[in-house]
């Protein structure tokens, strides 16, 4: 009976250790994915500029070329 109790304690410690390690791995994966940016955001940055949206000044366009009412893709 005593051996069975010791065996159950060892099994409980091993299972809790495994659960703790898996939890840390999940947190690491979440941190990895949260740092990644979508492709468009990596390419154009996150400065709120527009490719072909409406504009009033050059600074509102990603390419810095406001064609009067809309951003121009040509410089």
From Swiss-Prot:
Cellular compartments annotated: Secreted
Written domain comment of the UniProt record: The presence of a 'disulfide through disulfide knot' structurally defines this protein as a knottin. The cysteine framework is VI/VII (C-C-CC-C-C).
Highest taxon, organism lineage: Eukaryota
Designated name of the protein: Conotoxin Vc6.15
CC annotations in GO: extracellular region
Cystine pairs: 49-62, 55-66, 61-71
Transmembrane segment boundaries: none
NADP is among the record's keywords: no
Expressed in which tissues: Expressed by the venom duct.
Signal peptide annotation: 1-19
Family annotation (Pfam families): Conotoxin
Gene Ontology MF terms: ion channel inhibitor activity; toxin activity
Keywords: Disulfide bond, Ion channel impairing toxin, Knottin, Secreted, Signal, Toxin
Function: Inhibits voltage-gated ion channels.
Organism per entry: Conus victoriae (Queen Victoria cone)
InterPro entries referenced in this protein's UniProt entry, alphabetically: Conotoxin (IPR004214)
Family assignment from sequence similarity: Belongs to the conotoxin O2 superfamily.
Positions annotated as propeptide: 20-41
């Amino acid at each position: 009976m005593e051996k069975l109790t010791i065996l159950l304690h060892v099994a409980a410690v091993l299972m809790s250790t495994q659960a703790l390690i898996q939890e840390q791995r999940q947190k690491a994966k979440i941190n990895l994915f949260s740092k990644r940016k979508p492709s468009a955001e990596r390419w154009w940055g996150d400065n709120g500029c527009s490719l072909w949206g409406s504009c009033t000044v050059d600074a509102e366009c990603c390419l810095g070329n406001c064609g009067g009412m809309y951003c121009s893709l040509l410089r």
